């Protein structure tokens, strides 16, 4: 994968049509009211997988065109999904969506694009690419180096998040 093929600076390519990174409005106070949404849309993102809770950051769904989807899968900051099965259900939903819309481009994000995002991306590799726990974590971390945030933050952020990825691998 080309290291420069990514929608915004603090993002990275996960697979051919899947990208991950910070919240679209992460730098809202430094840029326009719409943050990085115009750049993400120009890049061709058609599905946003939002891992934040509703009270964490400003809502951005109203800035999206009607043909762009936002899927909410809230996870508390620095925490893990409610269950392995809930992530399996999410991935089955994404699998169906990608089957119906093969040209869809998915953008996975939490707030900073590190802990929760890294956890879901590692699980993505286990589910969609059939990688082992170690392979998935290694690949996620390699891809994450495309984001400047990787210079000062590890992904996933917590031991609990890493253990969730291990549990996901054991149950997949």
Identify the residue ranges that each predicted region occupies:
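Short cysteine clusters
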Residues: 110
């Amino acid at each position: 994968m080309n290291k420069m093929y990514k929608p915004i600076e603090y993002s990275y390519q996960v697979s051919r049509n899947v990208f991950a990174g910070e919240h679209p409005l992460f730098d809202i106070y430094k840029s326009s009211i719409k943050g990085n949404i115009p750049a993400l849309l120009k890049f061709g993102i058609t599905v946003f997988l939002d891992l934040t809770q509703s009270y964490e950051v400003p809502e951005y769904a109203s800035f999206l065109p009607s043909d762009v989807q936002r899927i909410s899968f809230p996870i508390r900051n620095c925490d893990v999904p409610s269950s392995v099965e809930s992530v399996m259900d999410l991935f089955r939903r994404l699998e169906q969506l990608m089957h119906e819309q093969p040209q869809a481009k998915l953008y996975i994000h939490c707030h900073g694009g590190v802990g929760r995002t890294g956890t879901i991306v590692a699980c993505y590799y286990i589910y969609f690419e059939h990688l082992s726990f170690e392979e998935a974590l290694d690949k996620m971390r390699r891809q994450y180096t495309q984001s400047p945030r990787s210079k000062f933050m590890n992904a996933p952020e917590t031991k609990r998040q890493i253990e969730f990825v291990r549990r996901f691998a054991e149950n997949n």
